[in-house]
Swiss-Prot record:
Keyword Lyase: yes
Broad class of the protein's primary localization: membrane
Tagged with keyword Phosphoprotein: no
Name of the protein in its database record: Receptor-type guanylate cyclase gcy-22
Organism: Caenorhabditis elegans
Tissue: Expression in ASER neuron begins at an early larval stage and is maintained in the adult.
Cytoplasmic topology ranges: 492-1058
Catalytic activity as recorded in UniProt: GTP = 3',5'-cyclic GMP + diphosphate
Lineage, uppermost ranks: Eukaryota, Metazoa, Ecdysozoa, Nematoda, Chromadorea
Extracellular compartment residues: 25-470
Signal peptide start-end: 1-23
Gene for this chain: gcy-22
Keywords: Cell membrane, cGMP biosynthesis, Chemotaxis, Coiled coil, Glycoprotein, GTP-binding, Lyase, Membrane, Nucleotide-binding, Receptor, Signal, Transmembrane, Transmembrane helix
Start and end residues of each Protein kinase domain: 501-809
């Protein structure tokens, strides 16, 4: 068939669905291969790619890229990569006023057609497989743009990767399996060799094109390569070739850490196809070699599945109308770049129209397209200065779990001042994994271009040791003897001195490894306090403590300790170490036991004995503890005794005394911590809150030495907290902040600020006077620790000095009052429980309610024979329409209250009311033998009798009447639901009873045949009257009966109508 006839047929089949050509129609030509060409169809076959144009046009319309074009007139020619057909098609399209031609998809037709397009100044957009560097020549092909990249870009990226790791000697192995119309490895290797020839630092030491891909041919190539290179560039065009190479690499022992194989791919698949898997049992060999491979491939795009689904859907619509075109493989097919090609033209035309040129020529189109960026079907599309897509290459390897991992990206530098294909310096590498991750399967080391001992292992240079070994050994032996003698003497002297020092310092040094963290419980904690948010009125075990900003908690030799953190490292003098030993030996009832320092911990810590009730600050802040005057006095006396001891001991004044450093043990005894440690305190920086307990003179000059008068001032602030049972200065209820308050304290004056001592609790006025004397602005006028101790002793008035005795007395009185309170509350609880039970028994059967109260499940229960009652108010809808909603509710309430009173006189269980409907049953949940039909019948007679006298309050002339239906049969019961549980009946008997009611008559009892037989044959004494057959929904014609009341029996006997 001639070319012209082929074009005519394609045009005939591709334009019938679109409107006539006019100024609002985008004319697009499309060149592809026929689906029956085996070597081309998987890549550029019409049935693989054409649907992408339908998807692309939908996106153009959705984004409003071409508002002036209402439709697209798409025509195509299946040139099968023939140069003549491609040239003829381009000429026909150009003369036919097409806007653009998408193709040709093959290199040689693109070169010929590109020359013709240059002459016609007509735009072509290439979308086929990567092409070689010839088409990048803008002078020769100024009207060609491309949404696929050139093999030169990948070759340049390979050069950049080699330069990055300083690999200079390389080998090439490649295998060509594809048609020379759409080659991949051949142009890539050609471009790569051209770049290497222009690079003085790189050398190709071995090159092999495989003609066959058997293990034997690979083994021959690998044996020759082994003596020439360790870095191998691989390009293979089939998974079989890839797998066989890997198996041969392992079988020939070339899968060691010194080898690296770089596989060049363009499938956007990386390792995803797991091409080492096969059926010959050699998967392990192939995988072992795969771990030494780096795969350079185009970056994958995430939305492939959705795009392919849209393409398949587009194939089923005109103009393609190919519902069977569904076998699309995006890793082989160029379906994505084809869709991007149409998007590129739409974006470029949009930009050209915006600049006033609605009909750009091919050259103008390419100029507009340069530098354009948009999100296409294959990810982000960037057009460089060659009107070609800038590729983003990624390098994959296998991690330690043999999972694919991206380790680096290689991108083009889009600096317009540079030629993007001139040199590898225009490409840069971005590592997306650490070097350790990249080279994990190589033992964590980057392979060398040339092994240290050469490719044959015989070129290792002799070391200095090998050349002069004898001389070295002799001199070393002599020197060694001399050195050993000198070192032995020095070691003996140093060791003796160190042992003495260690013996003395072992008293206060604690190895961090001996500290054991307690198991933690979930509890909130403060960042400053020793005490978490648990109550301070009870003893708190260390297990419930969590580390804070200043403190950590440990076990030391099974004893609970607390470690205060010091975020610095200090050098201690001999005097400092002597002071630590003295502190270690301190044993006072009101001082927290100093355990020592841990010098080998991550941060310097001082270790103290743990006090279970936290600090005074925590006790006061909690506010839940009832403290009478004696309790407060005892705590203040303990603090005063601690100050007295420190001021009369070698340790000296505290300097950091505050309510947070006064700890409380399980016996409610105050123990002052963080005393001494002057060598550490000089490096500590006080926070603003710490200055609230600091004497004014020290705030003004922090370089002043610590004095006893400072401790007296701090004691006064602590006492004010105990007296008022509030934090220092009660900042929580004040409007000023800490900085402002500290400034006022520092400023002083005639009336310096001091905490309030106002309290509603009982307190001793003498104590308030003592506190005011202790915080005197003039340090010289403050009392001494001896005077404080004497004055506080006089305040006790000869009462018991034991706080625990006082606490026990208070607890006994509290326990007595608590017992009375508990009895009263229990009585109230019992009454409430009775009321709850009454309400529950009204909602559920008693035996069911009892099970639910015990937490037991209520299993469904089957009852073989019960009698079910249904009733309904006659003409209730009409009656309700004449009433207000409130009147309807009152009416039903009065009616059902009357009914409920009647039910209580019979062995009947009320199941529920639904509007004006009433459902009852007898024989469950309490089984009553055969009495259920009798009970229901008697109740029915009573209800009919009661409604005769019932009156509607707001409609006194109206009369209420009901229909009644009864049925006897089996049911299943169960409790349904967790929220508002209901005791429900299930079974056909319920439906039958309902049908008896709905087919009954006002004022009469309509019963089923089963119920009639039970009343007349089992129980006896009841009279019924056949009604005849009634059409019952779901059952057809059913024989039913009337149950006669006493009045009806009498009327019947008198010959009156019922």
């Amino acid at each position: 068939m001639s070319f012209i006839s082929k074009c005519f047929i394609c045009l005939l089949f591709s334009t019938y669905f679109l409107p006539p050509v006019n100024s609002a129609v985008l004319q697009v030509g499309f060149l592809a291969a026929n689906d029956n060409t085996t070597e081309l169809a998987p890549f550029i076959g019409w049935g693989q790619v054409a649907g992408a144009l339908g998807v692309a046009w939908s996106r153009i319309v959705e984004y409003g890229l071409l508002p002036g074009y209402e439709t697209m007139n798409l025509t195509w020619v299946l040139t099968n990569c023939r140069e003549a057909d491609a040239v003829g098609s381009v000429i026909n399209y150009a003369e036919g006023h097409a806007h653009v031609v998408l193709g040709p998809p093959c290199v040689r037709p693109a070169q010929v057609a590109g020359s013709v397009a240059k002459y016609l100044d007509f735009p072509l957009i290439l979308w086929g497989p990567p092409f070689d560097s010839s088409l990048l020549n803008q002078f020769e092909y100024p009207t060609i743009a491309s949404t696929t990249s050139s093999t030169l870009y990948q070759a340049t990226s390979l050069i950049r990767l080699l330069e990055y790791y300083k690999w200079t000697e390389i080998a090439l192995i490649y295998y060509v399996a594809r048609s020379d119309l759409i080659p991949r490895c051949t142009p890539l290797i050609s471009d790569f060799e051209g770049l290497v020839n222009n690079n003085d630092n790189l050398t190709i030491t071995y090159r092999r094109q495989m003609s066959v891909i058997t293990n034997t041919s690979y083994a021959t190539a690998l044996r020759n390569l082994k003596e020439l290179a360790r870095v191998v560039i691989v390009c293979l065009e089939s998974d079989e070739a890839r797998r066989n190479l890997m198996i041969s690499i392992s079988e020939n022992g070339m899968d060691g850490d010194e080898y690296v194989y770089i596989m060049a791919e363009s499938r956007r698949a990386g390792f995803a196809s797991s091409f080492w898997n096969g059926t010959d049992g050699k998967n392990d060999l192939a995988l072992r070699a795969a771990r030494k491979f780096l795969v350079m491939d185009n970056q994958k795009y995430n939305d492939t599945t959705t795009f392919v689904q849209e393409v398949r859907a587009a194939f089923s619509r005109p103009p393609f109308s190919c519902p069977n075109c569904t076998n699309i493989d995006p890793t082989v097919s160029q379906v994505g770049p084809l869709g991007d090609a149409l998007l590129l033209y739409a974006y470029a035309l949009n930009r050209s129209i915006a600049t006033g040129n609605p009909n750009p020529t091919g050259t103008e189109f390419c100029e507009v397209a340069k530098g354009m960026e948009f999100l296409g079907f294959t990810g982000k599309v960037i057009i460089n200065q060659n009107s070609t897509r800038t590729p983003l290459f990624v390098v994959y390897n296998l991690d330690s779990t043999d999972k694919e991992m991206i380790v680096m990206q290689i991108t083009e530098d889009l600096d317009d001042s540079k030629d993007p294909v001139a040199s590898s310096v225009n490409y840069y590498i971005t590592l997306v994994a650490t070097p350790a991750q990249i080279w994990d399967t190589w033992g964590g080391t980057v392979p060398l271009s040339t092994p240290i001992c050469g490719f044959t292992g015989t070129d290792c240079p002799k070391s200095f040791t090998d050349q002069y070994l004898a001389i070295i050994l002799g001199c070393t032996a002599a020197a060694l003897v001399l050195i050993i003698a000198v070192i032995s003497t020095i070691v003996f002297l140093v060791r003796s001195k160190r042992q003495e020092e260690e013996r003395l310092n072992q008293l206060w040094q604690v190895h961090f490894s001996s500290l054991v963290k307690p198991p933690q419980k979930n509890t909130m904690h403060s960042s400053r306090s020793l005490q978490s948010t648990v109550t301070t009125s009870t003893k708190v075990t260390i297990n419930s403590k969590k580390d804070t900003e200043r403190h950590s908690f440990y076990f030391l030799n099974n004893d609970s300790v607390v470690a205060r953190k010091h975020n610095f490292r200090a050098t201690f003098t001999k005097n400092d170490r002597a002071m630590f030993r003295k502190m270690r030996n301190v044993d006072n009832d009101n001082l927290c036991k100093f355990i020592g320092l841990s010098l080998d911990s991550p941060t310097l810590i001082s270790i103290w004995r743990y006090c279970s009730r936290g600090s005074l600050q925590d006790v006061i802040a909690k506010g839940s503890l009832q403290m009478d005057w004696f309790f407060k006095y005892s705590l203040m006396r303990d603090v005063a005794d601690a100050i007295y001891y420190l001021h009369h001991s070698p340790i000296g004044p505290h300097g950091w005394l505050s309510s947070s450093t006064c700890l409380v043990d399980e016996r409610w005894q105050v123990k002052v911590s963080f005393f001494g440690l002057s060598a550490i305190k000089q490096y500590e920086v006080k926070e603003q809150r710490d200055f609230l307990h600091t004497a004014p003179e020290h705030i003004r000059d922090t370089n002043l030495p610590i004095t006893k008068e400072m401790d007296i001032y701090s004691f006064a602030i602590i006492c004010s907290e105990l007296i008022t049972k509030k934090s220092a200065w009660d900042l929580e209820n004040e409007t000023f902040d800490i900085e402002e308050l500290v400034y006022k304290i520092k400023k002083g004056g005639r009336s310096p600020p001091r905490p309030s001592l106002e309290t509603e609790d009982e307190h001793n006025g003498s104590m308030s006077l003592l506190v005011r004397d202790c915080w005197n602005e003039n340090p010289d006028q403050r009392p001494t620790s001896e005077q404080i101790k004497t004055l506080m002793k006089s305040m006790n008035h000869n009462r018991s000095s034991n706080l625990m005795d006082h606490v026990f007395n208070v607890l006994e009185q509290y326990a007595s009052n608590l017992e009375d309170e508990v009895q009263a509350r229990m009585k109230e609880l019992t009454e409430e429980k009775k009321r709850s039970d009454v309400l529950l028994y009204r909602m559920l059967p008693k035996q069911v309610a009892e099970k639910l109260k015990l937490g037991q499940s209520v299993e469904p229960e089957t009852f073989d024979c019960v009698t079910i009652f249904f009733s309904d108010v006659v003409s209730f809808t009409t009656l309700a329409s004449r009433c207000t909603p409130l009147q309807v509710v009152n009416l039903l309430n009065d009616l059902y209250t009357t009914f409920d009173a009647i039910i209580e006189q019979h062995d009947v269980y009320k199941v529920e009311t639904i509007g004006d409907g009433y459902l009852c049953v007898s024989g469950l949940p309490h089984r009553n033998g055969n009495e259920h039909a009798k009970e229901i019948s008697s109740m029915s007679f009573s209800l009919l009798k009661a409604i005769k006298t019932f009156r509607v309050p707001h409609l006194p002339k109206e009369r209420i009447n009901i229909r009644v239906g009864l049925h006897t049969g089996p049911v299943v019961t169960g409790v349904v639901g967790m929220t508002m549980p209901r005791y429900c009946l299930f079974g056909d008997s319920v439906n039958t009873a309902s049908r008896m009611e709905s087919n009954g008559k006002p004022g009469r009892v309509h019963i089923s045949t089963e119920c009639m037989k039970f009343l007349t044959e089992v129980i006896g004494g009841y009279q019924t009257e056949p009604r005849g057959e009634v059409i019952v929904k779901g059952k057809g014609a059913v024989q039913t009966h009337w149950l006669l009341t006493d009045d009806e029996i009498e009327a019947k006997e008198n010959g009156e109508s019922i």
